[in-house]
């Protein structure tokens, strides 16, 4: 989503107001500001790099939105807000699109190394699809960049887009959590990363990709020198059980973090006990994932729609690789019941999923009609009377998704489809997408991109790449030239009429091939202490963590 001057001013004002409110609260209340806040998120925190397939599906973006910053961040409505603490973007040319990126002169990592244009080059190379070996979640936007001019060690770069590929939502690129510290890889390999990438040195590119994929994996006793921060917080430690402790970054050049320490903890089965004994302060998870979580008197709860769609994502291999098998499971899935149990309407859109508007509502509505209610007879016929065992997996614990699998299993049994539920424990199976890729399950029940949380970038044209050939989080391995062309066209079109045409052209193909089955829009629950200040919702995968450096808890 592009943000105009009004949007930038509006959300800059929101940040200032949040800071002012927190300051006034601390002044007015008899209590004092807490030194630590405990923040509970949906999924695992297995990597610092939220741009890998596993990282994008994790809760990493919620945790590290103010640890690895960029030229923009996602505000409370999911829109991009320019982050001038980090730098500025200037449009130099429109056709083709040319952008100048200027990193702030005082931008420095927590280890003392400068933030430079080398970080942009690595970000582009890893996610452009042009360099082999990178396990990137998405190529959206980056694949349309033709070249980046960067003198190693400098703070300015010029980005040239491919002619006729003026990406509408270019502000999504090089934003918070997208830019990893390239000097960490440069120091490990003792090379100039920018030179190696821009000269396409195949041997070095392979080594760079391997480290980009793995060097930022998080585990207890990890070498924290590999995890420098460019934001108000930095990692202090990784705890047993997967929690990550963030502390104020003393080298941060902007407004200092209000709270000095935030422990980010993945949701566990004992969440109700933790809330009851006030050992957690902010809970930012999918509605229903924690069951019927009771809200104590000293907590406030806000539910709101996310930009992500809960869906069935079919494996590219095994029994569900065949379109007939996928359609059979879709035919017996009672989407109306599943959505009703979640208190929601059925979602149909695959290529316009991030927002609830007239365009998204119309996307695929006609083609989806036969898949709204369970039709076990049609499912049986689609399989020619054969039986079909199906393993549906989801990241647990998650009461809502467990119930959904049970509903599908009951409805599909009549059709000869035996559905078994597979709970993926974050301690042993940290990634639903990885389990799907490894063949441990036939279907992944998750949100956009296979995420436990929202999973969405906040931009429908970016999220649509989940079904583009070769995209990392195209978990079903779907490939269709017509759909690819339409996804590419959506990324460069701001014309509503053209977008409607492209969606209408894609819907019959997608509902026939059935790479995924959308169910309903994931709802988010934000539960917090009544003495918490400046915590606000966010429909994207960055969640409430988008402004955690402004949070204040009064004891």
UniProtKB/Swiss-Prot annotation:
Its main location: membrane. The keyword Lipoprotein applies. SUPFAM superfamilies: Periplasmic binding protein-like II. One of its GO terms (molecular function) is peptide transmembrane transporter activity. A lipid is attached at residue 29 (N-palmitoyl cysteine). Keywords: Cell membrane, Lipoprotein, Membrane, Palmitate, Signal. Residues 1-28 form the signal peptide. InterPro entries: SBP_5, SBP_5_dom. It is a lipid-anchor. A lipid is attached at residue 29 (S-diacylglycerol cysteine). Disulfide bonds: none annotated. It comes from the Bacteria. GO terms for cellular component: plasma membrane. It is found in: Cell membrane. The keyword Cell membrane applies. One of its GO terms (biological process) is peptide transport. It holds the Pfam family SBP_bac_5. To M.tuberculosis Rv2585c and M.bovis Mb2616c. This is Uncharacterized lipoprotein ML0489. It comes from Mycobacterium leprae (strain TN).
